[in-house]
Amino acid sequence: GLPVCGETCFGGTCNTPGCSCTDPICTRD
């Protein structure tokens, strides 16, 4: 299935593939 991009992040990168960091949470690219 599609990756779930729910981790928190602050100006960095996301551990989940296909996700980008939009402070303060990762969102799907």
Swiss-Prot record:
Reported modifications of this chain: This is a cyclic peptide.
Biological process (GO), any one: defense response
Record key words, sorted: Disulfide bond, Knottin, Plant defense
Cross-link Cyclopeptide (Gly-Asp): residue positions: 1-29
Top-level taxonomic group: Eukaryota
Disulfides per UniProt: 5-19, 9-21, 14-26
InterPro entries assigned to the protein according to its UniProt record, in alphabetical order: Cyclotide, Cyclotide_moebius_CS, Cyclotide_sf
Domain notes: The presence of a 'disulfide through disulfide knot' structurally defines this protein as a knottin.
Family according to the record: Belongs to the cyclotide family. Moebius subfamily.
Main function: Probably participates in a plant defense mechanism.
Name assigned to this protein: Kalata-B11
